[in-house]
Amino acid sequence: MIFHPRPSPIAAAMYQLRDLGVDAIILHGPSGCCFRTARLLELDGVRVFTSNIDENAIVFGASENLKKALDYAIEYLKKELKKERPMIGIVGTCASMIIGEDLWEFVDDDRAIIIPVEVHSGSGDNTIGAIKAMESALKLGIIDEKEFERQKFLLKKATEVEKKRGMAKKEYIKPTYDDDLNEAIKVLKDLKEKDGKIACVLNAKKETAYLFAHPLIVLNKYFNCVNIANLDINKGLPKIRRDAQNILRRFKADYITGGLDEYPITGERAVEILKDLDVDAIVVSGVPHALPIEEIDKDIIKIGISDGPRTYHPIKEIYDYAIVELDAHAKVLGKRDIVKSRFGEILDYALE
């Protein structure tokens, strides 16, 4: 059992709907539910509405609340986006699911494409929310069976990585806001003086790659680097492919391990490539704990860069140095180009 806070299945469903290309999301619940996720998705171009369930609606039913929110959202989107049939996700919350609201009630509304996702924060692992979103998309014919099975497999692998090697591997992981930044920079400065060779590995989750590619781009300025990246432009939903294309304009990859949504499995491919390289250091940016880095020669310097204060200890257990980029996801939403990272900017200054 995990006792520290974990991401919500509701939020995961919302981000997955974003990847599917929805114009808007209606949260069928109280106005404050998933507030941070809703606000961040607005930065990414998704309009977020709420059915504003209150105590009366919890007692007497909230169908009328949802109808009013849907009517307003459709009218708003048609006016603002000039779309005849906007795509709208309707996402459940703890409140609406506990009182048994029917999210599929309005799915046949011909004014919009409606994708209902019956989910709440007690549904289980956060990836359950994303899987439920894909189940609805499959049922409505928005994706095919092959893509659904692919997404389901990857989402389950993502959970497996976190439970075995990441933030869900222990009952409680203390957040750490200090990292090994100074030590890592000293090691890299020494390596530069020796004309050392570095393997740069981008193994990032979806759009976070806009930030996690940055320190690797900086390293390429000062070192002889071999670049490995999960930037396959032929894998994933359209948004995922576009993000990979955008990053490849700025970051040249010598080896491609898979798509941006395949980070739970591309780490193994990256390690197979690394085993055949003659390098002095390996820098992995994004989700470094998805790489079985323990299989690499112990004499090679290993630096892992990831997001969030609870990732430090899991990464430090398998890497020589762990770097934490705070709020990486929030910084990249709405962006379509490289976003500067804390480590990358300090590294650039230190290596000049």
Swiss-Prot record:
It catalyses: Ni-sirohydrochlorin a,c-diamide + 3 AH2 + ATP + H2O = 15,17(3)-seco-F430-17(3)-acid + 3 A + ADP + phosphate. It is an enzyme of class 6 (ligase). Keywords: ATP-binding, Iron, Iron-sulfur, Ligase, Metal-binding, Methanogenesis, Nucleotide-binding. The keyword Transmembrane helix does not apply. The keyword Ion transport does not apply. Its cofactor is [4Fe-4S] cluster. GO terms for molecular function: ATP binding; iron-sulfur cluster binding; ligase activity; metal ion binding; oxidoreductase activity. InterPro entries: CfbD (IPR017675), Nase/OxRdtase_comp1 (IPR000510), Ni-siroh_cyclase_CfbD (IPR052673). Its EC number is 6.3.3.7. Disulfide bonds: none annotated. GO terms for biological process: methanogenesis. Involved in the biosynthesis of the unique nickel-containing tetrapyrrole coenzyme F430, the prosthetic group of methyl-coenzyme M reductase (MCR), which plays a key role in methanogenesis and anaerobic methane oxidation. Catalyzes both the six-electron reduction of the tetrahydroporphyrin ring system and the gamma-lactamization of the c-acetamide side chain of Ni-sirohydrochlorin a,c-diamide to yield 15,17(3)-seco-F430-17(3)-acid (seco-F430), the last intermediate in the biosynthesis of the coenzyme F430. Belongs to the NifD/NifK/NifE/NifN family. Homodimer or monomer. The Ni-sirohydrochlorin a,c-diamide reductive cyclase complex is composed of a NifH homolog component CfbC and a NifD homolog component CfbD. This is Ni-sirohydrochlorin a,c-diamide reductive cyclase complex, component CfbD.
